[in-house]
Amino acid sequence: MAEMSFLSSEVLGGDFVSPFDQLGLGAEESLGLLDDNLEVAKHFKHHGFSCDKAKAGSSEWLAVDWLVSDNSKEDAFSGTDWMVEKMDLKEFDFDILFSKDDLETMPDELLATLDDTCDLFQPLVQETNKEPPQIVNPIGHLPEGLPTIDQGAPFTFFQPLPPSPGTLSSTPDHSFSLELCSEVVIPEGDSKPDSTTTGFPQCIKEEDAPSDNDSGICMSPDSSLGSPQDSPSTSRGSPNKSLLSPGALSGSSRPKPYDPPGEKMVAAKVKGEKLDKKLKKMEQNKTAATRYRQKKRAEQEALTGECKELEKKNEALKEKADSLAKEIQYLKDQIEEVRKAREKKRVL
């Protein structure tokens, strides 16, 4: 039981400590990159100083805070201003960094090497400040909604190294030259179609990485194709992207065009003819209805006139019938009186 509890405590301790160990290893690796590549420590060592003092001095005046700063959030070029500046070593207080004995023995060659390290990257900055080769952007200005390049991921930290032709020739291969995509506007005749088709997929591929939308910076096709790391990615992405021509992209997004004027005129004429037919039919129906009403009224008036005449005739005939009935009754009475009179005469 004691052994099981001891093993479980070790496992739990390892679980709790492991994430902090990983963070510590990442921090040590990031600091180790700076300390290993700084060649200033070697100059200190040649002139009789210890490695600890050289590292202390280099870490004091080359602090990690101003190398790894938040300039990437503001602008892509704001972090490279320190490469152009010349550092005046008189402003630094070397009494704090080194003892007086060390300062007295410090030769002038050390100061010269420090000045050289400050001016090391000046030719590289001049090359980046030159106008990049102008290439036609086949899709025009990219929309702001698309993500641009992550400013922290593709850049490599410039490290002060001793000026040598080997290092100066090798650094442009690993560093990227930048260009503003929104400012590249030249006529189509000046650029070759091959360069545009191969450069366009790389620009789109680099923009897939999430970053700030304010900078609007994409990688230049010449620099991306020149580096050995990005050449296979461009060769893979170019066939798929080159198939999409600018006309196809614009045609898919645009709505269908309006009908030509000839079809409009024909449609208007057909509609006008239909309306005219309907209006004519309506007028004919109205006239037929009015005529029918007029006929009915005339017929009714005629019938009413005849009815009145017949009623008058009927009344006249009734009067005649009454008069005739009275005459018949009078005649019957007369006949009865005559018959009675004859019977009396016979009796007598």
UniProtKB/Swiss-Prot annotation:
Ranges annotated as spanning the membrane: none
UniProt crosslink position (Glycyl lysine isopeptide (Lys-Gly) (interchain with G-Cter in SUMO2)): 53, 256, 264, 269
InterPro entries in UniProt: bZIP, bZIP_sf
Disulfide bonds: none
Record's keyword terms, sorted: Acetylation, Activator, Biological rhythms, Cell membrane, Cytoplasm, Cytoskeleton, DNA-binding, Hydroxylation, Isopeptide bond, Membrane, Nucleus, Phosphoprotein, Repressor, Transcription, Transcription regulation, Ubl conjugation
Annotated region (Disordered), positions in chain: 151-174, 187-265
Ranges of Low complexity composition bias in the record: 242-253
Membrane recorded as keyword: yes
Signal sequence residues: none
GO biological process, one term: integrated stress response signaling
Modified residues (Phosphoserine): 211, 215, 220, 227, 231, 242, 245
Complex formation: Binds DNA as a homodimer and as a heterodimer. Heterodimer; heterodimerizes with CEBPB. Heterodimer; heterodimerizes with DDIT3/CHOP. Interacts with CEP290 (via an N-terminal region). Interacts with NEK6, DAPK2 (isoform 2) and ZIPK/DAPK3. Interacts (via its leucine zipper domain) with GABBR1 and GABBR2 (via their C-termini). Forms a heterodimer with TXLNG in osteoblasts. Interacts (via its DNA binding domain) with FOXO1 (C-terminal half); the interaction occurs in osteoblasts and regulates glucose homeostasis through suppression of beta-cell proliferation and a decrease in insulin production.
Protein name as catalogued: Cyclic AMP-dependent transcription factor ATF-4
Naturally occurring in which organism (per UniProt): Bos taurus
